[in-house]
Every structure is written in structure tokens, then in C-alpha cells.
Amino acid sequence: RIAAELIKYASNAFLATKITFINEIANLCEKTNINIDDISIGMGLDERIGSRFLRAGPAYGGSCFPKDTKAITSTAEKFKTNLSVIKSVIKSNNNRSKLLLKRIYQILNNKIKNKKISFLGVTFKANTDDMRDSSSLTMIPTLSKKGALIKYFDPTGYKNDFNKIKNVSFVSSIKKSVEGADLIII
């Protein structure tokens, strides 16, 4: 039984590592003015690496990666083994939303109050209605508390998690979400 669990944990930890790796490379690309998509495509052409899970974006979330990366490090600790790479992945991923918020503040010159911000997609990945550990769960309330006026659209029609947050509204189309926006977050 433990082998099957460890296979699942290790597989998901590896995929989480790939996502976190490309997000860190995206940070470097931003500083060096290189397009991360070009890097992702080039890396993906290498058969040893492959193109899946090499798309820079928000922190990983969902029901598996956060849970399984924590589970494998917990299992390792029980057996007095240090999984420093996976611990670093967890730490980097946890910092990703903070880094994205910092970029938003920079783009808007720290003037968040009354800025119209559009979120296109709020789930942890495309084509799902799963909000578990989605970056938007951190970012939207934080921006709202600073006075941003937020509209969001998600093609899955997801609209429940933000209903009670001041200055946040679900809209029924991309067009309505981006109309008059000072900043669009995809």
C-alpha cells in the first residue's frame, strides 16, 4: 500500500516541481526581458523534458499537488529523510501569489484604491470549477481590502467564493469583465 501512495505523491511532487521551476524561470525572464513562452517551447522540444506542465502562471493549486507535496515531505520526515527539493518547491509555490500581488502593485504604482481589475479565470487551472488552493483565493480578497474594484469571469461559470467580498462581482462574459479595466489578470 505504501508503494502505491508513494508513487502518487512522488508523481504529483514531480509535476509540482515542473510548474514551480517554470514559474521561477519566468521570474528570471522578466528581469532579462526574455519571453518565457519562447523558453517553455524550447525546453518542451527536448524529449527528456516534454512540454506538459511548462506553462508559467500562478501558483499550483487544486486537490492534489498541495496535499501530495505536503504528504510526501511528512512521510519523509517520519523516516528521517530530508526532501529539500520538494520543501523548496512548496516554499516557492507559497510565495508565488505574493510575488504576483507585488507585480500588480508595481504596475499600478501602488495606487490600488478604485482601480478596476479584471480576473479572467479564477479556478486553479483551466477547464475546471475547482477552486481549491487557487491563487485567486488570496489575490482577490487582498486587492479588495486595498480598495480595488474587481470583476471576474470564469468560463466554468464559477461565481460562489467571492460573493460576500466587498467590491467584487462575477460577470457573464469576458467583454463585461475587461470593459474599463485598468488591469487584466489572466
Functional labels for PLM-detected ranges:
Residues 1-186:
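Structural/interface elements that position substrates and couple domains in central-metabolism enzymes
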